[in-house]
């Protein structure tokens, strides 16, 4: 029986710290961030769908949010100011992220990989869904900053 270490590798998310360059009241793991982003993404999509009548898939976006930073298991968390410093650097990091997502997908059986690749790459999402996921990601960061501001670490 062949072993597929995909889930074992994703289990490492709980040990990968985010926000390495910022003070924090407590360390936030990649696992916590992805759960927060998934909850926020699902809620934003439900609002978009039910109130504004958009054709988005809340469940698909929520699952994609669970994997949206999975490549950081292999790459680490690059600070946002560095990631967006210049277009060549941003493009290079996007290529590194895409390669890491491909590497993660390769840890699955072929039959499963076909259904997972779109979540790992974000390719399963429409442009509107991608925007909502990005908004959820940013809301998660804003909430983290608000909590930091109101904590003893501020």
Residue spans of the language-model regions?
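Histidine- and acidic-residue-rich, metal-dependent catalytic cores
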Residues: 40-42, 95-124
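Divalent-cation-assisted or electrostatically stabilized phosphate/pyrophosphate-binding catalytic cores
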Residues: 85-99
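Aspartate-rich (DDxxD/NDxxD/DxxxD) Mg2+/diphosphate-binding motifs
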Residues: 75-87
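Short alpha-helical hairpin
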Residues: 2-20
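Alpha-helical phosphate/pyrophosphate-handling elements in metalloenzyme active cores
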Residues: 25-59
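Conserved small/polar residues in nucleotide/adenosyl-binding loops
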Residues: 149-154
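Active-site alpha-helical segments that house and flank conserved acidic catalytic motifs
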Residues: 39-45, 59-78, 134, 138-141
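Histidine/acidic-rich helix-loop-helix segments that form or flank divalent-metal centers
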Residues: 2, 59-63, 109-147
